[in-house]
Amino acid sequence: MSEENGNSHRDGHRDSQRDSLQESQREKHSSSKDITLALRGWDYESGTLNVRKVAGLDGRPKLQMRLDLGLLQMELTGRPDGLKPHGCESLLDYHENRLHEHRARHGTDSEFHLSAEQCQGLREEAVMYYQRYLSLFVIEEFGAVVRDTDRNLRLIDFCGKYAAHEEDKLVLEQYRPYITMMNARAGASIQVSEGKLPDALETITVGLARIKKFFRRFGQEDAYRQCNEARILRRLAKRIKRQLPVDPVARLHRQLQKAIKLEAYEEAAKLRDQIQGMEQGA
């Protein structure tokens, strides 16, 4: 064999070894449980909720929340961890099915109860949905936020009605104002995007009424005026009102009242004439 052919053979052998090593490394990375590659280029920012949607290996989109020591990955529909407890979409669905079966057998809710352990499982599940609707709000998927907040409010009602122990009836109630606020914000945001500003204001009004009802129920009406959830909704309502088209007659009426208050009677007379002319013209 010539020296040239020998060198060529050795070079080809080295190339083959290198390709084999690279392929082995690729396979190792693809099967590795190390999440370093998933986090690369996605730094954790303290004080900021970092969320993204990614394509899952199963072909379905996933929701990821960046944490200081890694990430939280959730399904976008169904139970956030992708599990189906007792073959149901969620534990809440499972226990609601149990209730329906109990009613079918006995014709009443009487004697249907949730044990302390069952309530604990429902609370843990509620946290998963909280983490998801918070993430969904960040990426402005407001319809899904309404879905998940409605669901957690339903869970609070369910535990409140059927928990066997008083503490299990009440432990989630402290979160009702926050969930109600997020539900109203998401619903109003959808309506604003559709140009339905009056509907958005009505959604906020209903949310505020529900929060007020919560505090009244526990004899804490003064706390309602100071609660952060109500302040957030009132600020949102103000922003929406600024987007409403201005009624020129209503604006002139406001100017008239201001002129009368300042005793600017000549200005008030002019404003009355303008109002009268516009109303007659209408």
Regions found by a protein language model. Give the residues of each.
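Alpha-helical linker/edge segments of TPR/alpha-solenoid repeat scaffolds
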Residues: 104-107, 177-193, 224-248
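Alpha-helical solenoid scaffolds that mediate protein-protein interactions
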Residues: 145, 152, 159, 206-210, ...
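N-terminal alpha-helical interaction modules that lie
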Residues: 2-7, 23-159, 205
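Conserved small-residue packing positions in alpha-helical repeats and bundles
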Residues: 132-136, 140, 181, 186-189, ...
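Acidic, Ser/Thr-rich low-complexity linear motifs
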Residues: 116, 161-177, 216-227
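TPR-adjacent "capping" and linker segments in tetratricopeptide-repeat scaffold/adaptor proteins
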Residues: 112-126, 168-180, 238-248
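TPR repeat positional signature
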Residues: 129-130, 148, 177, 184, ...
